[in-house]
Every structure is written in C-alpha cells, then in structure tokens.
Design a protein with these regions (language model features):
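Secondary-structure transition motif
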Residues: 1-62
C-alpha cells in the first residue's frame, strides 16, 4: 500500500499521476512544471503538503 510522502521529502516525477493532500482535501491529480494540478477540478493546488502514488486496483473479488 502506498504511504503519504511529504513534499519536503520528495516530489513526484513530472506529469506523474498522484493523489494529493491539501487542507483536509484529497484530490486526484498530477505534478507538472507549474506544480500540483487537480485533474477533476482543473485547477492548481498551491498548498499541497503530501502526495502518494496511485494505488493498484483491487484484485478480483471472488
């Protein structure tokens, strides 16, 4: 399982899809040359404090 990574410790690769955390908001987005971008809201997230890799989908449930 993915763990939250502080932006002070490490940043994602450019254009890498991530889950981001900002002020009690978890968002799906990516990291670009402009910073963190929210894919669904189509906006910049300037106060992102943590991020994580997109988790793998669940295994097939029987």
């Amino acid at each position: 399982m993915s763990e939250w990574i502080s932006v002070k410790d490490r940043l994602p690769k450019l254009n890498q899809e991530i889950l981001g955390y900002e002020k009690d908001i978890v968002y799906w987005g990516f990291y670009s040359q402009f910073g963190f971008l929210d894919t669904l809201e189509e906006c910049e997230r300037k106060e992102t404090t943590h991020w994580m890799f997109i988790p793998n989908p669940p295994k097939e449930v029987v």
